[in-house]
Amino acid sequence: MTSFTGIWVPIVTPFKNGEVDLPAAQKLADELINQRIHGLVVCGTTGEAAALDEIEQAALLAAINEVSGHRCPVAMGISGSSTRTVAEKVKRFNRHAPAAYLLSAPSYVRPSQQGILWHFQAVAAQTDTPIIIYNIPARTGVNIDAATIAALAQDERFTAVKESSGQLSQVKDILDSSRLSLLCGDDALLLSTLMLGGHGAISAAAHIRPDLFVHLYELVQAGRNEEAAELFNALLPLIRLLFSEPNPGPVKAALAMQGKLRETLRLPMTPMSAAGKDKLAPVLQEVMDLQVETNSAALLAGRAKFIQDVYGSTASF
């Protein structure tokens, strides 16, 4: 059974000549998995899902599933304004066997909390696949209140929440009122969320030096909070720059600087500005040069326990 903890990466969608570049996506996914991330999400906000048609989304999910094998769970982002349309899409995507659906509140229409509750329940009725509740009010126009999340948590199909409200008070309310794994969706609040008892993150910034984000998570799990804070402070300037312009422009700029993909986005999303890239380049280099000790006995023991809990084996990967 998939464990919705640790560092998950909402993988960007590479493009070539205007089309989805599946080989580049697979190569990037393989590199991320080899850095010991705990999960991937395709067709999330960072993956420009709104600019992909359903055929492209299905092909991307299949390609990432193929390269991940059993090394890493792959969740699928699902969003839309119409409950019927979203439910029908989930029903079609069940055959592609994602590890979970990352499901946001209906965008633009701004339903009541009752409407949000019924929306999630109606979509969940179409699948046995676990659902991660995605709260991102800055994009949907509506917050999913902690009480609504607690009500949804009564249904076993809801297993986690990606919390992107930017409010630590809501993080605490969710942790106090539901059984769900809480995954931080605001990278600038990653350390604070983990310190409050959060279970991990779905982190766009973790495209860059994913090993350091995994190490940060492991440090907190091992109770080495001072070291975790020191590492997070070293990552924070990069995190801020990666969200200084609309996501995923800066993330793709950073990956392009490393030669990992073309810096191409689909309209209406645009590449990072030249001024932004001038600021990003030296900070990116500092993070790429950062060296930390990641193989202490305590961390290795914690890593082995995580692998045992999730995969039923103490073999590393």
Role assignments for model-derived ranges:
Residues 25, 57, 61, 86, ...:
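A general structural signal for well-ordered alpha-helical segments in protein cores
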Residues 122-126, 137-243:
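Catalytic alpha/beta core domains of metabolic enzymes, predominantly
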Residues 2-141, 151, 294:
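Active-site beta->alpha loop and helix N-cap motifs at the rims of alpha/beta catalytic domains
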